[in-house]
């Protein structure tokens, strides 16, 4: 069984408060983009989980989100058969694009079908919450408002198709460290999430671009000024709007046409290796079933 595991971007990301358990309450609008890992899942006779990947930079043991998802399903539902999972990585790693979470979501969906568990989407989402805050959104996909620590997902009207240029600087960002460094009393600009929802419902790309905002950006930019450099280049090449996604370091811009996006990409290639021109989309989970 072969599945697509789509990346996400945050059109808005607001941090409301810090909870007693150390996590933060957020309000964010997430959007699926047409950039995906390819997940190949097959049954094996031995009672084990084998994960392989095209990238040397991600773990293949119980630190891998796909492995965790498979382990959770096997344990929770008493599945005695084993699984072999291969991940063809196309989504930049540790970028703010939910690369690990979306792989986990694909494995949950795939094993549900492979083992005939007949779990509903809501039941899959409950499992996803145990793995990570972004997994529920990755199970739903499209355009959605995510609240709580990100795990409460409300589907929105699909955003219009937009040209999205993603650039990931070669720096490492710790999500936990970014949240810990965020001083909510010093946040000067917050997203207008409701205005973004209206812009999405109206299909107004310029208003969507105008309302892009991420309160985590100032924290990550303080550590890595290259993020502002990327944003400036995108704006100088007619991006309608640009913002960091998640805790970074990936940045995306919305462009009215591909020509401007490609010109920006050419300029960014001077100092950034991972650049992707894509579009917003809905989830299309199964690319092939055997």
Curated annotation (Swiss-Prot):
Q: Which of UniProt's keywords are assigned here?
A: ATP-binding, Isoprene biosynthesis, Kinase, Nucleotide-binding, Transferase
List of catalytic residues: 8, 134
Single GO MF descriptor: 4-(cytidine 5'-diphospho)-2-C-methyl-D-erythritol kinase activity
Q: Please name the top-level EC class of this enzyme.
A: transferase
A Pfam family in this protein?
A: GHMP_kinases_C
Extract the NCBIfam families matched here.
ispE, PRK14608.1
Which family is annotated?
Belongs to the GHMP kinase family. IspE subfamily.
Q: Which PANTHER family does this UniProt record tie to the protein?
A: 4-DIPHOSPHOCYTIDYL-2-C-METHYL-D-ERYTHRITOL KINASE, CHLOROPLASTIC (PTHR43527:SF2)
Q: What is this protein called?
A: 4-diphosphocytidyl-2-C-methyl-D-erythritol kinase
Source species, please? Caldicellulosiruptor saccharolyticus (strain ATCC 43494 / DSM 8903 / Tp8T 6331)
Gene behind the chain: ispE
């Amino acid at each position: 069984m072969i599945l697509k595991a789509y990346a996400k971007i945050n059109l808005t990301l607001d941090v409301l408060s810090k909870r007693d358990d150390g996590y933060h309450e957020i309000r964010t609008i997430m959007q699926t983009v047409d950039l995906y890992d390819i997940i190949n899942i097959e049954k094996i006779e031995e009672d084990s989980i084998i994960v392989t990947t095209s990238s040397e930079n991600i773990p293949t043991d119980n630190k891998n989100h796909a492995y965790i998802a498979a382990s959770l399903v096997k344990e929770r539902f008493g599945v005695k058969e084993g699984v072999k999972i291969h991940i063809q990585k196309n989504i930049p790693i540790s970028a703010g694009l939910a690369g690990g979470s979306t792989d986990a979501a694909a494995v949950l969906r795939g094993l549900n079908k492979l083992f005939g568990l007949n779990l509903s989407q809501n039941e899959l989402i409950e499992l996803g919450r145990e793995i990570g805050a972004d997994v529920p959104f990755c199970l739903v996909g499209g355009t959605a408002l995510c609240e709580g620590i990100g795990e409460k997902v409300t589907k929105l009207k699909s955003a219009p198709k937009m040209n999205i240029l993603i650039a990931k600087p070669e720096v490492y960002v710790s999500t936990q460290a970014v949240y810990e460094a965020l001083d909510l009393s010093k946040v000067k600009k917050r997203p207008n999430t409701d205005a973004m929802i209206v812009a999405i419902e109206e299909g107004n790309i310029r208003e969507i671009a105008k309302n892009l905002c991420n309160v985590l950006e100032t924290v990550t930019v303080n550590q890595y000024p290259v993020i502002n450099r990327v944003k400036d280049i995108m704006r100088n090449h007619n991006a309608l709007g640009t913002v960091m996604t998640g805790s970074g370091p990936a940045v995306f811009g919305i462009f009215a046409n591909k020509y401007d996006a490609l010109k920006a990409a050419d300029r960014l290639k001077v100092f950034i290796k991972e650049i992707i021109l894509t579009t917003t989309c809905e989830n299309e989970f199964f690319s092939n079933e055997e």
